[in-house]
Amino acid sequence: MQRRQFLATLGGGLFHAAAAQTKMNFIFILADDFGARDLSCYGNRFWSSPNIDRIAREGARFTNAYAACPVCSPTRASIVTGRYPAATGVTDWIPGRPSDPKGPVTTPRTAIELKLAETTFAEALKTAGYRSASVGKWHLGGEGFYPTDQGFDVNIGGNHTGSPPRSGKPYFGPFQLPNLTAREGDFLPELLTKAAVGFIEANKSNPFVLYFPHYSVHLPLGARAEDIARHKAKANGRYEPTYAAMVEAMDASVGGVLEALDRAGIADRTLIVFFSDNGGLNYEGRSKVKITDNSPFRAGKGHLYEGGIREPLVMRLPGVIKPGTVIDAPVCSVDFFPTFCDFAGVKPGKVDGVSLRPVLTGGKLKPRPLFWHYPHYSNQGGEPGSAIREGDWKLIEFHADGRRELFNLKDDESEKVNLIRKRPDIARKLQAKLDAWRKSVGAIMPKKNPNADPHWPGFQLSGDEKPTPPAD
């Protein structure tokens, strides 16, 4: 269903009926390149995250939450539309990595903006009287495709850029972002938090949806000097001090949002979500230690292994989500749009995700497969591929050489044992479903390169990024 049809269908009577009752608010806080183990509530012991941990303690923590892609723009598109990247055409970070003319396959170009024909959750919720804002990183197109062109009433700080402006010290003003004034030395996470809090305070008497995608903790690393120094003094080579300071700044931002909800007296009718767009960067930073450690998950950003797509996810809604809930059901970034619509009493239209309301209220989700399609080489060394997870089983098909890797995630969450030879029955079943899904969404595949260099060096992979030989 196209955008205009969707809005016409849901307009009119639904708006007036919904406006007569107290509605729930929605806040979605998105971290950038945040690792699956970067929070205390997920086992991190090197730095603290008391505010995000508070959401988990007072709400729910998910153990099998996934981004729809191992890089940023496609996952962002999936969040705001509820549709898989292969369906929206945004399959790589925008504008994407060019195809290597000597590589074994030619990779397709990603869409360089989210099509205006797509329906965003801002547009869907607008039909029920919601006011909406996007505060922070957008990275779904340039002018003409900004948040305010996609149904959001307010855009602060979002444009075509995928990383923080670099006119000065990383994450510090001055810099140029839409509707965001930054003086010399202003710290970007704090500026964005101030804007987000301002939107909450201005709309505390009206239903609202706040999409709050931080630029943090994306490269280049940057934080306050005193916070970096504090971590350098205690890191002792075990972790990246600047990254740790960035995580704590992110947590402080979440704390600012929670305090704003408490002051406004609307915490009990606000669903708040914290999530990341892809896995953490698992290579060395300036301190010669890994920027983050996704262990026990394999690899990181840019890879279809668990370290590239498994994410931290915590949600809170007082009176609805039981405090301390742990949810093991596999969920995906396509699920947030229908979840918001479900709680708001709005039909979501055509989406690939499902509402998470059942598991948030003590029930279960119907079994379903989850899909990934990333037909590109990533800047982090990832290969073009597609994947499917159904139950405990996960199959990855690599496009360049056709190899397949099959894992039982219940027994092997680190993806060390490739069971493709031992369980060909499972592999055939998953492959058939993956093929059918790709056909249904019109997924664009890489093509064999007739000009491929047989000596093409490819990426120099090491450690857990190397292919997994089949187990005998």
Regions found by a protein language model. Give the residues of each.
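Long, internal low-complexity/basic segments
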Residues: 7, 21-24, 31, 35-36, ...
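Loop/turn elements at helix/coil->beta-strand transitions in domains of secreted/extracellular proteins
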Residues: 22-26, 59-63, 128-132, 153, ...
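Formylglycine-dependent
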Residues: 90-131, 138-210, 214-225, 229-244, ...
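N-terminal secretory signal peptides and thylakoid transit peptides that target proteins
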Residues: 1-13
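C-terminal cap/loop subdomain of S1 sulfatases and analogous C-terminal strand-loop tails that border
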Residues: 154, 280-304, 321-325, 329-409, ...
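Short, structured active-site-proximal loop/turn typified by the sulfatase FGly-forming signature C/S-X-P-X-R
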Residues: 45-77, 82-87, 131-133, 153-159
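Histidine-centered active-site microenvironments of extracellular/periplasmic hydrolases
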Residues: 47, 146-151, 220-223, 259-320, ...
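A short beta-strand-to-alpha-helix junction
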Residues: 44-49, 66-71, 108-119, 182-192, ...
